[in-house]
């Protein structure tokens, strides 16, 4: 019985394993996520000129998001775009690309206070 209790305690204290790649991670504005020795923070939306849900557009537009990526002593602010370059960035063997940004704009609605960003993460090597 003591052995099982000790085993259960050890299992509960282990850090979760990194997910297999490729994977998607979803962050709310201000959230951070650790993956493969890096910490990715979704700082916010810098620009959102995507075509609103209730409009017809000749161009899909662009969403620009600001990320902070930290690994060890290194830290960088990075801007990724949905419609123009750079659409992805490679950092320490990982490539980050915007998979989705919600909510999408709506004509006549105020800009949302927070967004949900889904990043696609894959190995570059």
Residue ranges and their predicted role:
Residues 81-100:
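Short Fe-S-cluster ligation motifs
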Residues 13-16:
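Bacterial signal peptide processing site
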Residues 20-60:
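N-terminal secretory signal peptides
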Residues 100-114, 118-122:
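Short, exposed beta-strand-loop hairpins at the edges of beta-sheets
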Residues 31, 36-38, 61-65, 92-94, ...:
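Envelope-exposed proteins and targeting segments
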Residues 1-6:
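Sec-dependent signal peptide recognition
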Residues 47-81:
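Mature extracytoplasmic domains of secretory-pathway proteins
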Residues 9-11:
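C-terminal motif of bacterial Sec signal peptides marking the signal peptidase cleavage site
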């Amino acid at each position: 019985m003591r052995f099982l209790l000790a085993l259960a305690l050890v299992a509960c204290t282990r850090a979760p394993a990194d997910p297999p790649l490729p994977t998607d991670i979803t962050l709310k504005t201000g959230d951070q996520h650790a993956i493969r020795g890096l910490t990715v923070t979704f700082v916010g939306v810098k620009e959102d000129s995507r075509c609103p849900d209730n409009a017809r557009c000749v161009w899909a537009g662009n969403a620009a998001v600001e990320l902070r990526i930290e690994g060890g002593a290194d830290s960088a602010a990075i801007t990724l775009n949905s419609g123009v370059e750079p659409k992805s960035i490679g950092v320490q063997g990982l490539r980050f690309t915007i998979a989705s940004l919600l909510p999408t704009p709506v004509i006549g609605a105020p800009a949302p206070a927070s967004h949900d960003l889904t990043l696609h993460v894959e190995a570059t090597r």
